[in-house]
């Protein structure tokens, strides 16, 4: 124990500032037998001002279940302040008791922070970042908020040091925007990501996307989203549109004056949407076959559009058949069993191993798709929607970090062929390879349950990544301008249909109608995205398309500030000085900078506005 104390205890440099509560703390090790060890720690002061807590890989006990990293500042008495998490959730520091625990594998960013009247700090997990959760416990009005590393869930030996850097924030940066900017600046300085402005240079496909709305159209899908269907039986297929129908839809979009649209064909492949991936061919005759698909792609390009498709590299089904289905190639759990993902439209899905994806079929798939004439950024389902899954297959083992590296290799290959990579949810282990997130938010989705300590969301991810990754806020704000209906959304949140999905309405009342959903897109700097509707009318899409035109350049700009100006009124300020103010009130206008923001309305303040 004395040796361990020496390893983890550090000396603070003379430049350290006293009184932040970040200089000292402790590391707590929970062992699988129930024993726990508390080790006092003095943080190392880094050149960038961070207070660093480190536990070397060699000093992480292999019998540990958890390791907590807890500075003194992690203990906060109930006060007028708030906490935030890397999945955008926040809560006021006004409770007497309660517990919040992030779900492992669904924290978009490895950051967390606290703001009180006395201090503001942000923590960034820089080592073993794929293996921790956030733990927030409140008892007798005292909060304890810290990262917990789940050592027993790694499935391999710990593969890197635990490193957590804490930054004290002051002045105009002493808020959640400052927390997100601190994280963004660190990512930019280390070259982890590059601004979108730089990446579009010499990349016409990505440049097109940056000025286009995203329109996804589903032609067909399997109807096997049920445990009642035998695990490996071919489910029935619902045919919705042919390629001839799709051509007519694109013509209607063009006729309405929507010139900048990223067209993405969904459900085009063998057995339709969520059919037996990774098998893509033959293109179903019911849709018109491959020649009709090539014709539709060529027609869309003749209208001036960029054309892309939806695929899935994350899931594999037995129904894909030989030679794609080979049990030696599937992701394997620690017990040696094939990892099942769950029941999707195509039936029971298994996890792929991305080493196999890269080495077996990705290159040939991309080559075939390119030969069909596709020229838009490529959309790949799931990959950035969850953390990487470890694999214990003897021929292709990988821990989470190694699997993330293989995922990034797929991004590199896709970018080399199509200019950009699109996926969903924005888990930022994929940030270096991600160009577009179909949605970001976890509120009301499968990823995060409700908790008594959560009061809402703030655009933490958007502040960190707007100007780097294109996005729109939530699953619920896809088709924002369309009336989707409460019943349809509630049906998807029925736990009997999909384990883990929780009621959206409790925390997202304001997102149930087109007006509120559209305001959320503008508030969060979103790129309008359309997918779940049948496009029986294009008027709502056209309305949102037109509204976005004066603001669409903001996809290139960093967000520097986000504020609550009044009840139900919020302001977003970009680095170029431009602002958007949204008013969620049903009946109260709000005056700002010489303009009146109408109830359920917004105002854009471009450069030169008084």
What name fits each language-model region?
Residues 1-4:
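Positively charged n-region of N-terminal signal peptides that target proteins for export
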Residues 8-17:
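Hydrophobic h-region of N-terminal signal peptides that target proteins for export
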Residues 12, 187-190, 471:
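Short, flexible helical or helix-coil boundary motifs
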Residues 19-268, 285-287, 299, 303-306, ...:
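Carbohydrate-recognition beta-sandwich/jelly-roll modules
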Residues 73, 313-315, 427:
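Short beta-alpha junction loops
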């Amino acid at each position: 124990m004395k040796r361990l104390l020496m390893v983890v205890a550090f000396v603070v440099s003379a430049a350290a500032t006293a009184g932040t509560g970040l200089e000292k703390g402790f590391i707590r090790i929970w062992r699988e037998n129930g024993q726990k060890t508390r080790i006092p720690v003095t943080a190392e002061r880094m050149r960038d001002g961070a207070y660093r807590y480190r536990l070397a890989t060699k000093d992480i006990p292999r019998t540990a279940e958890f390791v907590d990293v807890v500075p003194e500042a992690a203990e906060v008495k109930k006060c007028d302040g708030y906490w935030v998490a890397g999945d955008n959730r926040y809560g006021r520091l006004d409770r007497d008791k309660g517990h919040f625990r992030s779900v492992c594998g669904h924290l978009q960013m490895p950051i967390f922070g606290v703001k009180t009247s006395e201090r503001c700090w942000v923590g960034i997990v820089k080592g073993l970042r794929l293996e921790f959760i956030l733990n927030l416990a409140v008892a007798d009005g005292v909060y304890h908020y810290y990262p917990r590393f789940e050592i027993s869930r790694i499935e391999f030996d710990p593969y890197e040091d635990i490193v957590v850097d804490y930054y004290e924030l002051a002045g105009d940066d002493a808020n959640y925007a400052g927390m997100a900017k601190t994280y963004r600046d660190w990512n930019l300085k280390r070259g982890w990501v590059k601004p979108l402005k730089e990446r579009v240079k010499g990349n016409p496909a990505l440049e097109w996307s940056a000025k286009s709305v995203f329109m996804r159209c589903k032609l067909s899908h399997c109807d096997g989203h049920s445990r009642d269907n035998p695990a490996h039986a071919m489910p029935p297929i619902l045919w919705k549109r042919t390629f001839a129908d799709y051509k007519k839809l694109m013509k209607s979009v063009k006729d309405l004056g929507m010139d900048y649209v990223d067209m993405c064909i969904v459900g085009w492949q063998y057995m339709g949407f969520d059919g037996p991936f990774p098998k893509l061919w033959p293109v179903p005759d019911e849709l018109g076959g491959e020649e009709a698909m090539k014709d539709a792609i060529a027609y869309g390009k003749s209208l001036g559009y960029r054309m892309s498709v939806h695929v899935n590299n994350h899931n594999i089904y037995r129904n894909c058949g030989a030679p794609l289905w080979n049990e030696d190639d599937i992701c394997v759990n620690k017990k040696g069993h094939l990892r099942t993902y769950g029941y999707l439209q195509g039936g029971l899905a298994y996890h792929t191993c991305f080493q196999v994806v890269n080495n077996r079929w990705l290159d040939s798939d991309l080559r075939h798709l390119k030969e069909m004439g596709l020229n838009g950024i490529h959309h790949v389902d799931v990959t950035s929607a969850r953390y990487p899954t470890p694999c214990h297959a003897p021929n292709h083992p990988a821990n989470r970090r190694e699997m993330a590296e293989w995922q990034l290799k797929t991004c590199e290959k896709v970018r080399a062929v199509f200019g950009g990579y699109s996926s969903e949810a924005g888990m930022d282990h994929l940030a270096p390879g991600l160009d577009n997130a179909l949605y970001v938010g976890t509120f009301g989705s499968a990823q995060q349950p409700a908790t008594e300590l959560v009061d809402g969301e703030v655009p933490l991810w958007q502040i960190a990544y707007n100007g780097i990754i294109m996005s729109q806020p939530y699953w619920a704000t896809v088709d924002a301008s369309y009336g989707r209906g409460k019943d349809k959304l509630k049906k998807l949140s029925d736990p009997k249909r999909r384990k883990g999905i929780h009621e959206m309405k409790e925390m997202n009342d304001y997102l149930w109608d087109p007006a509120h959903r559209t305001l959320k897109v503008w508030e969060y700097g979103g790129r309008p995205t359309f997918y779940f509707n049948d496009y029986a009318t294009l008027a709502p899409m056209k309305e949102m398309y037109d509204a976005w035109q004066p603001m669409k350049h903001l996809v290139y700009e960093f967000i520097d500030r986000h504020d609550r100006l009044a009840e139900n009124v919020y302001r977003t300020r970009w680095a170029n000085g431009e602002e958007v103010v949204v008013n969620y009130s049903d009946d109260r206008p709000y005056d700002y900078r010489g303009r009146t923001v109408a109830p359920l309305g917004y105002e854009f303040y471009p450069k030169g506005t008084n």
